[in-house]
Structures are given as structure tokens and as C-alpha cells.
Amino acid sequence: MHQLFRLVLGQRDLSRAGDLFSLDDSEIEDCLSQALEEIKVISCSPDYLTNDNDQAVVEICITRITTAIRETGSIERHGAALVSLWESCLEHNLQPQGKDEDTPHAKIASDITSCILQNYNRPPVMALAVPVAVRFLQQGNQELSRNMSSYLSLAAIAKAELLAQHTEAITCSVLAGNTMLLRVLPSVYPRQPEPIHQHVRELTAMMPRLDQTGRQHLLRLLQMISDLHPLVLSSLVPLLIGFLGDSDLGDSALGVLVNVAQSSPVSLAPFLSTLRNVGQKNPWLLGHIAKIHRAVGLTSEIQARGALQYLVSLLASMEHSAHHTLLLEIRCLTDRYTSILGGGGKDIYRMSNSFSAIARLLGRKLEADGAVSRGEEKVQDLPRPHEAESGSEMFAENLHLQVKIQAFEEKIGDEEVESEVDGASPGPQRRHSLGQAARDERREMRFNRSKSLALHAVRTRSINSDSSPEGEGLDLNAELNVCEAETSSVSSTPHNHTELTETQPDTSPNTEGAKVEDGDPRERDRLWIHLRDNMEEIKSFCAEMIKQIPVPEHCVIEDSHRGCVAKLSFSCPLKGHYCLYGKSSFSLCSSQPHLWIQIMLLALQSKESEALCCRDECVLQLRKLWEKTQLTGAHSFELAMTQTTVPHKKDVDSLQMYLEEVRFFDLFSYSEDKGGWLCFMCSNPEKATVVNQDGQPLIEGKLKEKQVRWKFIKRWKTRYFTLAGNQLLFRRGKSKDELDNNTIELSKVQSVKVVAKKRRDRGLPRAFEIFTDSKTYVLKAQDEKHAEEWLQCINVAVAQAKERENREATTYL
């Protein structure tokens, strides 16, 4: 051992301990292991906990030794001695004695931890360190556990097999609250799955308590389990179903359920109706939900019929690009249970480009099966007289429906012949051309026109046959409304639908098919069906939404360097004597035109007792706005408006946040009595008289004005400001008695904007800018509360000044 080390450690000489740092690393490299053994003897002595001198000597020596090991790269040479000292700390108390006060041995362990575990990419060192590191996780010292977890996570990436044998201890540490180690479990799971299987329920139950990072690691683990051992998760299906309501978890949780459904479809069968509701609210999840229905449908013919009816119904709600996936699931079911379609299964593959033909074929087959099952029920249980009457009415309705379908088949027969001829190319691949694109577009239009009639047949049979144990999981109320609408009278308002008229082939007016087609053209209107089926949800949403976000009175789509923006105008409906927007309006530009258009459509629908259709004038206007914003390849207006029933909460919140940024809520507030958004003056008539008194200040006090143009130079000068009438007065001094006045004409103010303290800071602002045609003023209040008061008063005064100017101009004219 080096002489200085022998002196310091042998005599516990604290005065000479600092001299160790004057030695070159190469001088002491050979004796580091010996020094560590001597330190171990000192730290294990009975009086070490009470001897401050020994503790100080040990801390200095450990710091010097670990520094030398790092600088010389000799961790593998001295690793055994270092780990031995590290392990000896486990024999002593490591729990903190007070707040932020570690025990002497906890300090030693902490100093050694980083030196050892920073070498996580060196297998010989990790082979010695990992067994000891895992034991530290159970000592109750959170700081040590956190540091250990961080390094073990890195070790799991570099050499997961070293941690695999300690999977049980790591899992128990996670369950005890050390969630940082969740990232280790996916690395060790393939090598040691059993310990995790034993605790998988407790791990899954932790999900709601985890942060975003922890959730991602746990979901990754569950995904691995579902890939390798899906049956382990079959008992956790109710827990996983509960995660589907969380937007952050839904997609991943559903992916896990898809894998579970492949191995244990019976465990998913009781939750099909829940999955359908989730799919209705989150259309992007329908692909996974369709796979689960296919897996459950393969368990029995009864389940297959129910799954088929649901999958066919999805053809109406999913966009065109998803139809191929749905057809694969349908094909899988019909291949397993050929009796459902009889000999017509091959037609599905032959007509794979004609979705309308597929929907019609499935509807007809399922209808026929439903009729057979109903016939058997009638033989077993003869109806009473009034039931017989009801049955005859049902038979008449079915006969009428068959006539409809037959007429529909005749109507599109020529089109399908054309489609089949187009599809008869000799090669395995078809060349895409402008002609093919046109045919695809016509095919899509035919599908949109046909799906309502075909699906009506499927859904009606789904309700009446009751062949599935879950009632097929469809919204019965909505489906009954579909049936009622089929027999209800059509609005007498004349409409012309150019798109549909152009794509319909000529038919004799005397044929039965023509009479059926002319019955209710709205049945071919995708938007009308969507709004009709979701009217209650839309009204409920709008009743709450209108209290958070106003509906624009006017909207114009304009091009800007950032793309299309919506220029929105809002005015006050009350038009009181002191109204801020009696002759003018509050305008803003939003970069979310699509969202505003959807909100305007929903607001219009919420005021109507009947569903709007594509031919209504207000809808046509919104469609024109949509088309101005539409990019190449984007969804059509009807498709986009029917993707989701109402906007997501985060979208509504983003609009509300934007309105706050442009200070909309300074000038408007929602009135429960009037049921609308009124301007500040009309909402507060008692304040209007005070505000409009000539010469009476609306607000006054001290503000700081920035003296230089550049924002990063913080040089502020205190001024005294007075807001009165049409002017914002300020004096060069701090007192209101100063004579040197400067004036900002409020009618010349272009805008008032907030200066945030930081881009990420979403708190209330302290500073704000006033823009005129010739100058910009940067002002700062003493705190956030005063800043809010000044901002609201200035915005109200500016709006009032501009409204007064507009009235004077109108009077003059």
C-alpha cells in the first residue's frame, strides 16, 4: 500500500487525507484494492457510526480511490474489492435518519454505486455487481433505490441475462413502488417469464397510478406477454377492457386484447358490446375490434352470425381504405362456416372490388337465415290472433324489403357487369391509370349509395331474428329509428342532389325499382344517416360545448403562409345601448378551420328537430368552406363529418386555449339567462354607465414600460397610466401629478397581445404589448392579477372606441 494511504488509513489522520489528491493516479493504482480492504475494516468497526473523524477519512479516501479507478480504467482489476466493500454496507442500517440525512454506510454505498454501475457495458463487472445491486433495492432507502434502478435499466439493455435470475426481486421492488424498474421487466421477461406471470395481475392493476413513461413500459410488457403467452392474460380481460376509455392506453390495450382473443376468444365474448361502444366513440380502433369479433365468431356459428352482422355494419362507418381489412375478416368467418352463405362464398373473392355487391350478398343470406329461424319458432309456438296479425305485417314488410333489394340489384346490375369486365385483366396485377381511378371513384359512389339499403336489411334481421346471445351488440334504439324512418313521410321541400343524379342509370318510371328509389332519397345520404342516428349525443354535446366555446357568426377561409386559416367573426346578439359589437364584430384567425366547420355543423344540427342532409343550404355552405381547405387526398366533407360524432375533448380544449390567447374572454362571457355569449357591456349593464362616463378613469396605476426595442434586453421604466374615454394616458414620471403626458389613441390600437414569461409557461401573464399603426408598447404589471385587470380593461376600451367610431361613420353616411 502507498505510504500516504498507510498513514491516513492506519492512523485515521484526517489532516493528511487531503494530500491524497496531490498524488498521481499511476502512483496509487496498484494499491487501490488494499486500500479498499482497509476501508472495509474501518467501516465495520463497532464505533464507526459515532466516530466523525473516521467517517470523514473514509469518505475522502473513497472519493480518491473511485476517481483513480475511473481515470485509469482499472475497474475490472479492482472490481472485486470495490464490490466487497459495497456489499458490506448491506449489513448495516441504510434507512435515512431524518430528512435528507443518510446514514454513514448509505453514504459509502452511494459513492461506490456510481463508480461500479457506470460500467454497465462491462459483463465481468456486472456479473459481480448485479446480485449485490438487487439486494440494495430492498433496503428501504429511496434515493439508493432510485440510483440503482437507473443503472440497472442500462444494464438490462446491455446484458439482460445478468438480471434475468433476479426477476422475482425486481418485480417485487416494482410492486413496492419502485416504478422506475418497470423498464427492466420487458428485457428480462423472455428469459424468466414465470415470476412475472405470478404477479401480472398486480402489475396490471398499477396502470392507473403510473405516469406516462411507466404506462408505456408496462404496456410494452403486456404486449410481449400477449405475443408469447397470451393465455396468461385471459383472466385479466376485464381489467384491460377498463383501460379502453383512456385515450393514451386504448390503442395499446386493444392490441393486447387482439392477441388474447386469438388464443382465448371465449374470454372476450362477454365484452363484445362494450368493444362496439368503444369503436363507435373511437373509429380509429375499429380495425382491432373487427379482429376480435372475427376471433370470437370462429368459436361457433351463432357467434359467427353476430360477428358478421357487426362487420357488415362497419362497412357504412369506416372509410374506403379500411374495407379490404373488413372483407378479410368476413372472408375468414364465411370460410369456416360455409353454411351461412351457402355456395356464395366464392362470390366474395370474385367481387372483391364491388363492396356494394358484397354487402347486398351478405344481407340477403343473413336475411334468409333469419327468416328460417323465425319460421321454426312459429312452428314451435303458435301465435295468438294479435301476434298472427303482427307476424303478417312483418311478412309484408319483409316482402316489401325484398322488392326493394331486387329493384336495387336490377338498378346497379349494369354497373357491376362493367366492374367485373374491368376486373378480368389476365395478369395478376392491374395497371393503375386515370381510367382506373375514375372507375374506383364510381365504385365508391355506388357503395355509398347502396350501403344504407343493404345494411338496413342486415340490421332489421339482426333485431328480429335475435340469433345472437348479445343481440348483436348494436344500438337497438338507433336501429329501430332506422326502421321507423323507413316508413315515415319524407320532407316535402324540393331538393336537387347533383352527385347522386349523375351516377344513377336510367330506369323506366313504371318499374317497381324506380318507385322504391324515389321513396326517400335521404336514405342514401351518409351525413343525414349519421346525424339522425346521433342526434341526442350531438344535442347533449352542444349544450355543454356552447358554455365553453362560442359558435362563429361568420366564417371565411383565407390562404396564408401557414396554409388555410379560418377568419371567424363573433358579435353580441343583444345589441344593447352600450354594446361593444352593435355595428362591428370581434374577428380572429384560426389555423384549425376543419374543427370550426365541424362545430358549426353540430351547432346547426342541435337547433333542428330533424337531421340535416347534404342538400340543405346551410350544409352546402359549410361544404364549400371545407372544399376550400381541402388538400389533395384528404377526406370529403361527408366522410370527415361522420368519422367522429363529436370532437374530442382535447380539440375543444385547444380551441378554448386559443380563445384565451387572443383575449376573447376579456370581451365576451356566457350568459345562462340569454343562452349565448354577450359582450362585456351587455353582460354587465351596471358597469356600462360607469365605464361610459366622460373623463372618469376606467383603471389607473403604475405599469413598467420597456425602453428598448429588443425583448432580450430587460430595461424597464415605471410610468403612471390612466385609461379613460378613448385614450390611454401615461406620464414620464411615477406620479399622476406629472405634467408631461403621452397619449395612445385607443381607436388606433390594432391589437393587444400577451408576452409570456416562457413559451412553456401557461400561467397568467405579467407583460403585454399594445400595437398601434406606428409603434409598439411593451408594458408590465406588478403581478399577474393586475395584469389581467389591465388587459381586460384595455381590450374593453379598445372595442368600445372602435364601436363608437363605427357608429359615427354609420350616422354620417
Curated annotation (Swiss-Prot):
Q: What CDD domains does the record tag this protein with? A: PH_MELT_VEPH1
Q: Biological process GO terms, please? A: brain development; ear morphogenesis; regulation of signal transduction
Q: Which UniProt keywords apply?
A: Cell membrane, Membrane
Query: Does the keyword Membrane feature in the UniProt annotation?
Result: yes
| MF annotations from Gene Ontology | phosphatidylinositol-5-phosphate binding
Q: Domain (PH): give its ranges.
A: 696-799
**Region feature (Disordered):** 414-445, 484-522
Q: Where in the cell is it found?
A: Cell membrane
Q: Where along the chain is composition biased (Polar residues)?
A: 486-511
Q: Which GO terms describe its cellular component?
A: plasma membrane
For domains, the record's comment is:
The PH domain is required for membrane targeting.
To which protein family does this belong? Belongs to the MELT/VEPH family.
Protein's recorded name: Ventricular zone-expressed PH domain-containing protein
Native source organism of the sequence: Danio rerio (Zebrafish)
Name of the gene: veph
